[in-house]
């Protein structure tokens, strides 16, 4: 320690002693009243010293108030800090509180000014160390408690930061925390724990979190829960709280989504809201069509009112108005949601510009020169939203980046509603949009002006059936997806019939009931007992009811199939006792009617639901559809393989899209009353068809039989669905279980359900097509849509089919052909294929099931005799007359061939071959050949025709036989003869011809004519038959190979194809086309006629796993078909079982145990440059 420091400390101690001494000596002179001020004011930075003696020196004693700390005592205007006084040991660190009393004059203070105390570091020791006692000084400024009172604790005036004002966010959080865990549902408050919510599925996700569907167990209500993570991000937290704050306060606005409560937890925040069905963004993607102006009128009314409410009541601007934030529910309510980036308006202006979606952002929010904007920015967003919904595309859809969008918003003219192109918007709507999209925000109207616009005035009072429109969109989507939730009709069969239109019949008894929107079915399904039950209008959408209904329906439906009670009874939906199925026509009358009403495959007959499941279970298209009726209600895709599903989803979609839109896609069945194409009301069509079918059935069959059929259908085994009273409308396949029963019950008189259907034939197939297109367009199934997966699936299916075909062929060779003369141009002969064949391949299994069903009935039918022209005829030729008898399994009399995809051209050719063949009824038309109508039936079959598979046997069979048996039989012949053609077209043949063989209608007709008696080998029939046709067509269209001939599996009644005419389509195309005029080369089914050809883009060459190379397939094909061993075609090539496999694209794609797998492992090295074998996308 340096000498100076030592001296400093010493001097300070000395001065302290002097000060204490002076204090004690002058104690009696202290004025009590004067000294307390400084002490009391210890926490105040500058304490006022009460009036001191006029002598400035008196202030010295006042300075003893230690409590003053750093403050400056303004006694006589002199700051304590200016005094050179060593601090009291326990004084504040600032030390300025201790003042030296050694100087009695103001000058002493001045001289010591630099001193700041012990810790000040600038203390200048006084020149004199002698302390000056000041006993004579009046210490007015310090009272008894003043000065350095050792007994008084020192109050340290430590600098405490001013308490931050409570932020708006914190206040909101505090208010919200008080409400956490309290849910207000249906007017009642439930204290709820997060464990009381059961997760049902995801609804969607966005920037701030995800929205899930949950069941509130206490109230048994399904709600939507928005789950948002709580991050340390202040912006994110602010957004969450803003959203919560707005929805909690907006409970009194019917145009804003209701908040039922919230849970604020450490990791996340859950906002519980009423469940809405969907947002308009998703709706637009589903419908792929513009939203009608009437609906947009209601959307505008709701949105403008909601925005106006936010502004007027809460001073909030939404800032994110767009289709995805406008929700709709099944009751037609339209509401605004998502207030996460809403902003408070200060003086009606908002400041932040980062919030919102670029495409909907107003120009003033983008332009940096305009720092503030107001609610009119939301008006612009509303205008853009309306243009997008009205045209089904974004006005800025060409832009790839937000920057391009923003540039376009700023620099280009504002968007407007287009003219022409079928856009017929009212002038009021156009004017409204123009006002909303005024670029200069000063000229843009605010909410009061908008609410006075004629467009809003009109739709505030107009009655618009929003629920029905919304339901139709959902139904179309569900149909396309085969979505099980479209259980409406499916679940109850009758419901099916009711479809959207008839639902009324189903649950509500009145078309108008909630049911009319299609949901009713679901509910009806819930309690068969209470068909009248309508959706209960809770705030919470019917989803809550839906869940239970979903399973119940399945169960309910199943029983329906089993129930022996008459249709009326079974039909909880007012399927009405009428066997007619008109029973409530709309209701889809009972099972039977359900069946018939299910003109669309979407709605399988209710009675046959069980079988339907069975039949369709393997069909990728039908799986979902039937899931309701499935025996395992909880397993949506019964027995479906994921691979298949995925394949269908992608391929099915594309094919369906193409085919459904094409005339071919029509189902023949629809021809029944369904002639009226109801775009969205398949059910209606179905119902009509059902009614007509029922009528036809009744007419055709003896009254007692008709009644029996109707009643029994539900009861009878679903071996092959009877059309049930109305099944005529459906393919036999659809009604197969019922059909069988019915056929049997009917006895000979009405052996086949198709017979009644035949009557429908009167209507032109085209009409049916229309209906079908509408019904079928959506059978898409979600799943793995990878082309590779799908292709592999197809190839595997082809292989299976080929094997099956071979086996069947052998079996059939051994079986005597069933000779049945058939009036039908299509062969009536059905050779029942061994049931095993049907199920052999998964694809064919569905069809095969149908075909089996069809086949058995077919055999029965002919026996019944009523099946005019035999089942084989399937009522094609005679079906019109026999109606019932000909029904043929698939209700497509000999139309088995009528694969959905049968090329239209074939119909013409077939026509040439057998004009008679062309049946008026779609069912009669053969898919491939026989009829100009084939196209329609083709698609129908695609869906409903799976049933036809069996039937197609007659005409299809002939063709099919080419496919299946004849192919094998004639393979040697045609392979040898057509070696050149085969070489050129082998791959195509393998992939597509197998399918197409069945297609050639002409050949089949010729065959029919020439050899009606010969049954076709199942394999062929499979190809020919819709069996494979229905499915395979589907497949074919997707990938010709997929449906290989076996698919049909139906025993086509078709006689064996003649070598020339009967040859497989492939040969036919090449060899036959030249020689036989009669055989106009029928386009192969998968090669849709020229009309459809454009829809089918070539498949990329598939990558094969072991055993799947085309060469191997061909080898198997030739071997199976009995090709002579020395065939020039193969000989040299097949030294090894198959050519070396190409390396896999990725190691993960190789099959374990395959050569690629080994190679992958052996040659794997981390350095890419050394991957010798992996040059493909590695």
Curated annotation (Swiss-Prot):
Annotated positions of the Phosphothreonine modification: 352
Active site residues per record: 320
Keyword Cell wall biogenesis/degradation included in the entry's annotation: no
Occurrences of domain Protein kinase (ranges): 197-456
Coiled-coil spans in chain: none
Post-translational modification: MAPKK is itself dependent on Ser/Thr phosphorylation for activity catalyzed by MAP kinase kinase kinases.
InterPro entries in the record: Dual_spec_MAPK_kinase (IPR052468), Kinase-like_dom_sf (IPR011009), Prot_kinase_dom (IPR000719), Protein_kinase_ATP_BS (IPR017441), Ser/Thr_kinase_AS (IPR008271)
One Pfam assignment: Pkinase
Biased segments, Polar residues type: 523-543, 724-734, 912-928
Biased composition range(s): Gly residues: 574-593
GO biological process, alphabetically ordered: antibacterial humoral response; axon extension; axon guidance; basement membrane disassembly; carbohydrate homeostasis; cellular response to arsenic-containing substance; cellular response to cadmium ion; chorion micropyle formation
Chain positions found as Phosphoserine: 348, 646, 662, 1150, 1154
The keyword Manganese is assigned to this record: no
Signal peptide: none
Biased composition (Basic and acidic residues): 636-646, 1168-1178
Any GO CC annotation of this UniProt entry: cytosol
Family as reported in the entry's similarity comment: Belongs to the protein kinase superfamily. STE Ser/Thr protein kinase family. MAP kinase kinase subfamily.
PANTHER family reported for this sequence: DUAL SPECIFICITY MITOGEN-ACTIVATED PROTEIN KINASE KINASE HEMIPTEROUS, MITOGEN-ACTIVATED PROTEIN KINASE KINASE 5
Protein name: Dual specificity mitogen-activated protein kinase kinase hemipterous
């Amino acid at each position: 320690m340096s000498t100076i420091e030592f001296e400093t400390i010493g001097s300070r101690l000395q001065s302290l002693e002097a000060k204490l001494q002076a204090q004690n000596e002058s104690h009696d002179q202290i004025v009590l009243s004067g000294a307390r001020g400084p002490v009391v004011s210890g926490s105040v930075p500058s304490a006022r010293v009460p009036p001191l003696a006029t002598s400035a020196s008196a202030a010295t004693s006042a300075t003893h108030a230690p409590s003053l700390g750093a403050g400056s005592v303004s006694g006589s205007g002199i700051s304590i800090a200016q005094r050179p006084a060593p601090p009291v040991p326990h004084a504040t660190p600032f030390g300025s509180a201790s003042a030296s009393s050694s100087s009695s004059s103001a000058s002493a203070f001045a001289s010591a000014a630099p001193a700041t105390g012990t810790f000040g570091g600038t203390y200048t020791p006084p020149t004199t160390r002698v302390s000056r006692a000041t006993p004579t000084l009046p210490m007015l400024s310090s009272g008894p408690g003043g000065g350095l009172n050792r007994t008084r604790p020192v109050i340290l005036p430590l600098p405490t930061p001013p308490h931050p004002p409570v932020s708006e966010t914190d206040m909101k959080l505090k208010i919200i925390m008080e409400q956490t865990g309290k849910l207000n549902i249906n007017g009642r408050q439930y204290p709820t724990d997060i464990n009381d919510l059961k997760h049902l599925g995801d609804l969607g996700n966005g920037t701030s979190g995800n929205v899930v569907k949950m069941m509130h167990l206490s109230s048994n209500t399904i709600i939507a829960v928005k789950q948002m993570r709580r991050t340390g991000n202040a912006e994110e937290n602010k957004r969450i709280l803003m959203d919560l704050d707005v929805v909690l306060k907006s409970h009194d606005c019917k145009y804003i989504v209701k908040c039922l409560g919230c849970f604020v937890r450490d990791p996340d925040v859950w906002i519980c809201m009423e469940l809405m069905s969907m947002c308009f963004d998703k709706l637009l993607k589903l419908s792929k069509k513009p939203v009608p102006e009437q609906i947009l009128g209601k959307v505008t009314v709701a949105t403008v009112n909601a925005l106006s409410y936010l502004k007027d009541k809460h001073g909030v601007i939404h800032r994110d108005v767009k289709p995805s934030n406008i929700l709709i529910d099944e009751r037609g309510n339209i509401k605004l949601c998502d207030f996460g980036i809403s902003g408070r308006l200060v003086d009606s202006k908002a400041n932040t510009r980062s919030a919102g979606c670029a495409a909907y952002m107003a120009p003033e929010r983008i332009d940096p020169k305009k720092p503030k904007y107001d609610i009119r920015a939301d008006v612009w967003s509303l205008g853009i939203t309306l243009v997008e919904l009205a045209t089904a595309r974004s006005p800025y859809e060409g832009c790839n980046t937000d920057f391009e969008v923003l540039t376009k918003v700023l620099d280009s003219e504002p968007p407007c509603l287009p003219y022409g192109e079928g856009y017929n918007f009212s002038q009021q709507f156009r004017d409204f949009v123009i006002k909303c999209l005024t670029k200069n925000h000063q000229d843009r109207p605010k909410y009061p002006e908008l609410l006075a616009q004629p467009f809003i005035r009109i739709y505030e009072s107009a009655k618009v059936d929003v629920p029905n429109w919304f339901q139709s969109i959902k139904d179309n989507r569900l149909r396309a997806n085969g979505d099980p939730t479209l259980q409406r009709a499916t679940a109850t069969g009758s419901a099916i019939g009711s479809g959207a239109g008839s639902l009324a019949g189903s649950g509500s008894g009145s078309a108008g009931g909630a049911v009319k929107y299609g949901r009713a079915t679901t509910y009806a399904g819930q309690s068969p007992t209470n068909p009248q039950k309508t959706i209960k209008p809770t705030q919470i959408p019917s989803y809550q009811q839906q869940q239970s209904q979903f399973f119940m329906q399945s169960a309910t439906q199943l029983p329906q199939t089993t129930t022996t009670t008459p249709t009326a009874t079974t039909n909880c939906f007012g399927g009405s006792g009428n066997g007619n199925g008109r029973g409530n026509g709309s209701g889809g009358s009972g099972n039977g009617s359900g069946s018939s009403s299910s003109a669309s495959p979407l709605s399988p007959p209710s009675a046959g639901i069980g079988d339907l499941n069975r039949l369709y279970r393997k069909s990728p298209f039908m799986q979902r559809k039937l899931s309701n009726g499935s025996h395992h209600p909880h397993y949506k895709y019964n027995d479906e393989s994921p691979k298949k599903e995925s394949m269908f989803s992608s391929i099915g979609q594309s094919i369906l899209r193409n085919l459904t839109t094409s005339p071919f896609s029509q189902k023949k069945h629809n021809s029944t009353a369904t002639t009226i194409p109801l775009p969205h009301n398949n059910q209606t069509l179905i119902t009509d068809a059902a009614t007509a079918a029922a009528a036809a059935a009744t007419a055709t069959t003896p009254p007692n039989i008709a009644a029996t059929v109707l009643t029994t259908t539900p009861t009878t085994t679903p071996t092959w669905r009877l059309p049930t009273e109305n099944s005529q409308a459906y393919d036999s396949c659809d009604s197969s279980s019922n059909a069988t029963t019915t056929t049997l019950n009917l006895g000979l008189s009405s052996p086949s359900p198709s017979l009644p259907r035949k009557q429908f034939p009167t209507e032109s197939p085209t009409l049916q097509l229309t209906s079908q297109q509408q019904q079928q367009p959506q059978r898409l199934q979600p799943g793995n849509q990878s082309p590779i997966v799908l292709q592999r699936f197809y190839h595997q299916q082809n292989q299976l089919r080929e094997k099956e075909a071979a086996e069947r062929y052998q079996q059939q060779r051994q079986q005597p052909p069933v000779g049945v003369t058939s009036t039908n141009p299509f062969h009536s002969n059905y050779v029942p294929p061994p049931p095993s064949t049907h199920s052999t391949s998964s694809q064919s299994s569905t069809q095969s099931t149908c075909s089996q069903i069809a086949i058995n009935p077919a055999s029965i039918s002919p026996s019944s005799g009523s099946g005019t022209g035999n089942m084989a005829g399937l009522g094609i030729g005679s079906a019109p007359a026999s109606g019932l008898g000909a029904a043929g399994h698939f209700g497509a009399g000999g139309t088995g061939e009528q694969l959905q995809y049968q090329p239209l051209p074939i119909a013409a050719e077939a026509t040439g071959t057998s004009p008679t063949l062309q049946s008026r009824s779609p069912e009669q038309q053969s898919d491939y050949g026989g009829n100009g109508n084939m196209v329609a039936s083709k698609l129908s079959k695609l869906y409903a025709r799976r049933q036809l598979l069996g039937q197609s046997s007659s005409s299809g069979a002939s063709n099919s036989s080419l496919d299946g048996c004849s192919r094998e039989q004639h393979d040697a012949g045609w392979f040898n003869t057509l070696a050149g053609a085969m070489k050129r077209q082998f791959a195509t043949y393998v992939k597509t011809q197998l399918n197409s063989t069945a297609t050639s209608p002409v050949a089949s007709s010729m065959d029919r004519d020439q050899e009606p008696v010969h049954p076709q080998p199942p394999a062929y029939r499979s190809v020919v038959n819709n069996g494979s046709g229905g499915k395979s067509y589907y497949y074919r269209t997707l990938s010709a190979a997929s449906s290989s001939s076996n698919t049909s599996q139906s025993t086509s009644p078709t006689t064996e194809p003649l070598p020339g005419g009967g040859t497989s389509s492939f040969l036919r195309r090449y060899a036959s086309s030249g020689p036989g005029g009669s055989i106009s080369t029928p386009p192969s089914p998968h090669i849709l006629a020229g009309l459809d050809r454009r829809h089918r883009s070539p498949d990329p060459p598939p990558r094969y796993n072991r055993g799947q190379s085309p060469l191997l397939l061909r080898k198997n094909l030739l071997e199976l078909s009995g090709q002579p061993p020395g065939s020039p075609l193969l000989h040299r090539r097949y030294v090894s079982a198959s050519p070396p496999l190409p390396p896999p694209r990725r190691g993960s794609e190789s099959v374990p145990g395959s050569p690629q797998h080994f190679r992958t492992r052996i040659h794997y090295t981390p350095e890419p440059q050394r991957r010798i074998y992996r040059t493909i996308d590695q």
